[in-house]
From Swiss-Prot:
Classification via NCBIfam families: dnlj, PRK07956.1
Source species: Streptococcus pneumoniae (strain Hungary19A-6)
Database matches in HAMAP family: DNA_ligase_A
Superkingdom of the organism of origin: Bacteria
Gene name for this UniProt entry: ligA
Organism lineage string: Bacteria, Bacillati, Bacillota, Bacilli, Lactobacillales
UniProt entry tagged with the keyword Zinc: yes
Binding site for Zn(2+): C395, C398, C413, C418
Cofactor(s) listed: Mg(2+); Mn(2+)
Gene3D superfamilies on file: 5' to 3' exonuclease, C-terminal subdomain, 6.20.10.30, BRCT domain, DNA ligase/mRNA capping enzyme, Helix hairpin bin, Nucleic acid-binding proteins
Record: active site: K109
UniProt keyword Cytoplasm present: no
Protein name in UniProt: DNA ligase
Amino acid sequence: MNKRMNELVALLNRYATEYYTSDNPSVSDSEYDRLYRELVELETAYPEQVLADSPTHRVGGKVLDGFEKYSHQYPLYSLQDAFSREELDAFDARVRKEVAHPTYICELKIDGLSISLTYEKGILVAGVTRGDGSIGENITENLKRVKDIPLTLPEELDITVRGECYMPRASFDQVNQVRQENGEPEFANPRNAAAGTLRQLDTAVVAKRNLATFLYQEASPSTRDSQEKGLKYLEQLGFVVNPKRILAENIDEIWNFIQEVGQERENLPYDIDGVVIKVNDLVSQEELGFTVKAPKWAVAYKFPAEEKEAQLLSVDWTVGRTGVVTPTANLTPVQLAGTTVSRATLHNVDYIAEKDIRKDDTVIVYKAGDIIPAVLRVVESKRVSEEKLDIPTNCPSCNSDLLHFEDEVALRCINPRCPAQIMEGLIHFASRDAMNITGLGPSIVEKLFAANLVKDVADIYRLQEEDFLLLEGVKEKSAAKLYQAIQASKENSAEKLLFGLGIRHVGSKASQLLLQYFHSIENLSQADSEEVASIESLGGVIAKSLQTYFAAEGSEILLRELKETGVNLDYKGQTVVADAALSGLTVVLTGKLERLKRSEAKSKLESLGAKVTGSVSKKTDLVVVGADAGSKLQKAQELGIQVRDEAWLESL
């Protein structure tokens, strides 16, 4: 039986690849169904012999308890946005300062969910959401139900690939029809539907909803020398790669492609929200490098957002965690990009003055980045009142005087005891990108704050289970989960805590870079500003902000209290040792190592202060080679780069 099951699995997986990836099936649907039913019958009779890559795994049946956190071996960066031809020209100019004659590759920006797929010896072992770029959620069982994701590869590879998981428009219509018939609320758009589907705990639901993918990158170090060759390699491995792409030599060619795609956009079977432009050559990508948040070798052009008219009814003013007071417009409801919009940001007081927005105005509303509703401009021909908006002079939360600094566009409350700032700071501290305390969302934080149970972030770690039971709507099971989530967050690596403290200009990526260098928040608090500013990708603004924060009254007390409650202040990732043997050097690993695993070699190099990259360029300082090193060794020799072997690395 085992032999026949092997034959059926191999056949069915090949036929599935022909159907979903190549769009060139060699057998009829009825023949595929016949073989599939035969396999199901055999697996039912011999369950102990079911193969890991059997296509029957794509059918639901598992109900998951939840999704575990998963640390990405290769971080997922966001992309810099561009909204005009001028911004693309500026991107091109920046690239040409480093790369004389770049070739670009243009790909469609799929409006879906970013995923990372990891294979070991050719078998899918992990499917993970993007999350914050460093930590995502393990949704492997759900992604196994996406029919065009290969469960096994034709080669026994260790590889991590990235792509977008989306819901085709036809599937979206079918899903919403079923929900309507069942009296359930319909999804606003295919992206929301895909996101909701991938977070289903019942994998049978995922299997029914016909999600699809486009893969676009090999995340693990690639032996290909260009993005285009990388995409073709992904196709060879059985992944679906979007065929709508071009190579371009200049922005004129890119702009023509963007216009062409814009005209075809509505006729595509899936949603897109732009075009991604990348430098095609991978060595050039290495030379250009990254900012704290995004690669310097890529940009995402976003199509102009849909616009609608709405009437301004009133304005609410709210205080954020940094004291900035933001105006939000209350509007007559309009349908915009698949959702009903009745509130939109007015950004700040300078924006209101610049756009001359007045009471009862008719305004144009759009979604900035296709996400955040915002007021774009006034329809002056429909103005009914000359009365200007009321601009507050006092904080809506604490009634302190508001300040409007010359170098800022917003009103600001500088009262450190402002209740709104404290509460927003607590919400930020517990959020996913910060301490990631599951269940401790805005509503619970607001109740805790109102009950005077928390007044700063250290108080969160003094809470007991019974404290949550004092809150309306919180039962014993929820209280236990909240308490457990808080205790678990104490073990987070310190970059999560640093970001959670809400220090101005210090985002999640900067927090990680800082802790990699200084190893602990205590070390960072004592660091010299010049040393902070010298760290690559950071600078004087962040250094000054950190100095101001740690010098402020109460910061030392807060850190001491956090430490006393058991919160970890040390970095748990791979640190950078300032005086290590390879400190500051860019190193490439190539060839087959005899004694060390590649991951072990990479970790050792990083522990010695090196930055390990996948391609040899003029910025490479050292190449460590094993057997069959190939083109990377040749490139290193051509550039006169120092070459070392495995024995040398072991001796360090």
